[in-house]
């Protein structure tokens, strides 16, 4: 039984599309996951350099529908399946697919998207395991290699770039957005000792949270506050995802000298009468630092392949856990019922404990069977137990397509 075969991914990155196209498709996928996610497990990773949608057990019709949504904005998108889809996600988490090799921002963005989509119920079952393992790979790569030494991500590169024009130690700086990139920018700017730092976010609580960690001042992300920052600050960094420009004019008497646009799509209007730094301006700097990390990248690639080899066993273990979870829950429920009939809390607890002690060794054996490649046998046995204890008959989530 190949538990990776139901995995598929639709991939679009900075190599195939510009920031504006990625932004539009990212918004499209945000709506799409709310339609597909409740029916089919789905995970969407949208950053300034990529929009990637992963599905588990999707029908060809669902996959085609997803691709068509991409094609509303670009000519084509890559489709990856099975182990190749997992390999790509592992490489993304490791920073091997980034403009800046080994950047750490992507790992934070991956975890942020994962947490949000698990809470929403979209990323679940065996897809959840795949994404969890990708996060594990990302952390392992950064712990065991030196691939992330130096600039942590595009935010770090943009700070290096801006420091060519502005003395940051004497500058007032504003960061628009308090997500993974914005928070990273704030942390590094604070470490560099900027004269004054402001954090703006649509949710003031999130801005306050970042501000407390960095000694900054939190403000709401409103048009009035953005204009105020342009008047007061020397540098403004924009790291927000929006379909509208957050900066579309420079007010008279503004102090701002440089605006950095890390938004996807672009969040700063073209043609402004000041220096605007775009993602494309950072490409040369990214190449320079990436070249220094190539030896460490080889070590990271080896880790990716090692973890990829272990993925089938992890999926098998999770598949059996899902299959027996309902059995265990139903058995405990029956034990509690019998205990209540006895009219004694002690009897109820004893019945429940006895059932768990009887079933747990069986559950562990089923997991071992799955890990040793006998997934189908383990699932067959678990389904026999399902019928015996009277739980609703059926295969575990997302396995009906795996034959």
Swiss-Prot record:
Top-level division of the source organism's lineage: Archaea
First-tier enzyme category under EC: oxidoreductase
Transmembrane segments: none
Annotated residues for binding of NADP(+): 177-182
Pathway(s) this gene product operates in, as recorded in its UniProt entry: Porphyrin-containing compound metabolism; protoporphyrin-IX biosynthesis; 5-aminolevulinate from L-glutamyl-tRNA(Glu): step 1/2
Annotated site residues (Important for activity) in this chain: 88
EC number(s) on file: 1.2.1.70
Biological process (GO), any one: protoporphyrinogen IX biosynthetic process from glutamate
InterPro entries reported for this sequence: 4pyrrol_synth_GluRdtase, 4pyrrol_synth_GluRdtase_N, GluRdtase_CS, GluRdtase_dimer_dom_sf, GluRdtase_N_sf, NAD(P)-bd_dom_sf, Shikm_DH/Glu-tRNA_Rdtase
Catalytic reaction list: (S)-4-amino-5-oxopentanoate + tRNA(Glu) + NADP(+) = L-glutamyl-tRNA(Glu) + NADPH + H(+)
Gene Ontology terms, MF aspect: glutamyl-tRNA reductase activity; NADP binding
Residues at the catalytic site: 48
Keywords from the UniProt entry: NADP, Oxidoreductase, Porphyrin biosynthesis
Keyword Cytoplasm: no
Binding site for substrate: 47-50, 98, 103-105, 109
Family: Belongs to the glutamyl-tRNA reductase family.
Note from the entry: During catalysis, the active site Cys acts as a nucleophile attacking the alpha-carbonyl group of tRNA-bound glutamate with the formation of a thioester intermediate between enzyme and glutamate, and the concomitant release of tRNA(Glu). The thioester intermediate is finally reduced by direct hydride transfer from NADPH, to form the product GSA.
Matches recorded under HAMAP family: Glu_tRNA_reductase (MF_00087)
Main function: Catalyzes the NADPH-dependent reduction of glutamyl-tRNA(Glu) to glutamate 1-semialdehyde (GSA).
Domain-related comment: Possesses an unusual extended V-shaped dimeric structure with each monomer consisting of three distinct domains arranged along a curved 'spinal' alpha-helix. The N-terminal catalytic domain specifically recognizes the glutamate moiety of the substrate. The second domain is the NADPH-binding domain, and the third C-terminal domain is responsible for dimerization.
Assembly description: Homodimer.
Name the record gives this protein: Glutamyl-tRNA reductase 2
């Amino acid at each position: 039984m190949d538990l990776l075969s139901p995995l598929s991914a639709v991939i679009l990155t900075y190599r195939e599309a510009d920031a504006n196209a990625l932004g539009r498709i990212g918004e499209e996928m945000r709506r799409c996951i709310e339609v597909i996610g409740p029916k089919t497990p789905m995970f969407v990773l949208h950053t300034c350099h990529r929009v990637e949608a992963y599905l588990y057990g999707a029908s060809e019709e669902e996959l085609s529908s997803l691709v068509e949504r991409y094609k509303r904005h670009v000519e084509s998108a890559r489709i990856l399946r099975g182990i190749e889809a997992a390999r790509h996600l592992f490489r993304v988490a490791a920073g091997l697919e980034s403009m800046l090799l080994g950047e750490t921002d992507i790992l934070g963005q991956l975890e942020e998207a994962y947490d949000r989509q698990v809470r929403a119920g979209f990323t679940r079952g065996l897809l959840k395991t795949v994404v969890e393992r990708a996060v594990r790979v990302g952390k392992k790569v950064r712990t065991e290699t030196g691939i992330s030494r130096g600039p942590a991500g595009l935010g770090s590169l943009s700070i290096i770039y801006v420091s060519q024009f502005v003395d940051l130690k004497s500058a007032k700086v504003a960061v628009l957005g308090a997500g993974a990139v914005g928070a990273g920018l704030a942390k590094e700017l604070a470490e560099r000792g900027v004269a004054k730092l402001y954090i703006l976010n649509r949710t003031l609580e999130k801005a306050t949270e970042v501000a407390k960690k960095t000694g900054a001042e939190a403000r709401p992300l409103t048009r009035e506050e953005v204009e105020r920052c342009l008047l007061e600050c020397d540098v403004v960094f924009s790291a927000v995802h929006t379909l509208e420009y957050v900066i579309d004019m420079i007010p008279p008497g503004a102090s701002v000298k440089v605006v950095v646009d890390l938004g996807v799509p672009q969040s700063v209007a073209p043609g402004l009468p000041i220096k605007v730094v775009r993602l494309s301006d950072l490409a040369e700097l990214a190449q320079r630092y990436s070249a220094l990390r190539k030896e460490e990248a080889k070590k990271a690639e080896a880790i990716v392949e090692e973890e990829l080899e272990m993925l089938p066993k992890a999926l098998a273990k999770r598949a059996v856990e899902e299959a027996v979870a309902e059995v265990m829950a139903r058995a405990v429920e029956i034990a509690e019922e019998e205990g209540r009939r006895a009219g004694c809390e002690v009897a109820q607890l004893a019945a429940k404990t006895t059932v768990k002690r009887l079933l747990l060794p069986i559950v562990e054996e089923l997991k071992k069977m799955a890990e040793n490649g006998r997934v189908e046998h383990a699932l067959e046995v678990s389904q026999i137990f399902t019928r015996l204890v009277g739980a609703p008959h059926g295969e575990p989530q997302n396995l009906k397509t795996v034959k």
